[in-house]
């Protein structure tokens, strides 16, 4: 049996990310065999991972990348969640998020579900994530997934602080002319959180709901019935300016809209996506 030294424990900890006590127990069980100790940590960790799945995992990071395609470019953004920001900011967690992103690109995945079933070496991404949960000692999961394509795709990754990984990723697809203002548009998406590209993209039920609320509010305020329709249209336009990207006032110059930016360069935006850590569907 090999001696279980502090150096040996440190080596296995660095290789696996497991806690000191778990590493010491694994090395003792493996009689000092490093490879066997890693197997024990992995096996026990995966078994424990199932117990963590009920916990909230709303911290994390977003890995993003733009790749060239036959028709232009495609942008990917993948959210990887952990329970704490302590784990989220570790180099190993950030590195793993980049690996998961790579699997998404390799598989040309179109959704989080497709990504989980994609190959990860000799395994699947789903199993790789379960193994990661074991190593980090927290519930780890793939969260939001975004993919857009166009002649040009611009990505902006926002960090809330220097020591933290990206917590917001904004992507926008444009034609070639629109590429000139794509970065400014991506900054706008990150900061202002638009939900739709044009007002035509807003679902009819959402518009009708806003119309009803605006009507009821106007009547409750005692506005004369004959002018209520005009007031309602004004409030709907204000709603569109808030949620529609191309109608939002440009943050750096509110005298113009984001749509005006593209008109000035003779370009167009064709799609966009925004992913923010912890803002996906409730678990």
UniProtKB/Swiss-Prot annotation:
GO molecular function, one term: translation elongation factor activity
Major place of residence: cytoplasm
Keyword Ligase: no
UniProt keyword Protein biosynthesis, yes or no: yes
Region (Involved in Mg(2+) ion dislocation from EF-Tu) location: 84-87
Family the entry assigns: Belongs to the EF-Ts family.
Name of this chain's protein: Elongation factor Ts
Organism: Bifidobacterium longum subsp. infantis (strain ATCC 15697 / DSM 20088 / JCM 1222 / NCTC 11817 / S12)
Organismal lineage: Bacteria, Bacillati, Actinomycetota, Actinomycetes, Bifidobacteriales
């Amino acid at each position: 049996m090999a001696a279980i030294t502090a150096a040996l424990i440190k080596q296995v900890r660095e290789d696996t990310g497991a806690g000191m006590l778990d590493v010491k127990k694994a090395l003792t069980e493996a009689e000092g065999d490093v490879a066997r100790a890693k197997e024990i940590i992995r096996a026990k960790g995966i078994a424990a991972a199932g117990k963590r799945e009920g916990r909230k995992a709303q911290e994390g990071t977003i890995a993003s990348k733009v790749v060239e395609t036959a028709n232009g470019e495609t942008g990917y953004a993948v959210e990887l969640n952990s329970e704490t920001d302590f784990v989220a900011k570790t180099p190993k967690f950030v590195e793993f998020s980049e690996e998961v992103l790579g699997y998404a690109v390799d598989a040309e995945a179109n959704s989080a579900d497709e990504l989980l079933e994609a190959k990860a070496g000799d395994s699947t991404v789903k199993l790789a994530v379960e193994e990661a949960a074991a190593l980090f000692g927290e519930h780890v999961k793939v969260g939001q997934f975004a993919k857009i394509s166009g002649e040009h795709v611009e990505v902006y990754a926002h960090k809330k602080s220097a020591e933290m990984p990206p917590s917001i990723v904004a992507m926008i697809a444009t034609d070639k002319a629109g590429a000139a203002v794509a970065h400014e548009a991506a900054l706008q998406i990150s900061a202002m959180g638009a939900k739709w590209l044009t007002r035509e993209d807003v679902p009819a039920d959402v518009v009708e709901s806003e119309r009803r609320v605006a009507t009821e509010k106007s009547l409750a305020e005692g506005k004369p019935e004959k002018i209520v329709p005009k007031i309602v249209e004004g409030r709907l336009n204000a709603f569109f300016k808030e949620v529609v990207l191309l109608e939002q006032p440009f943050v750096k110059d509110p005298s113009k809209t984001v749509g005006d930016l593209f008109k000035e360069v003779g370009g167009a935006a064709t799609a966009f996506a925004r992913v923010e850590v912890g803002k996906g569907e409730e678990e």
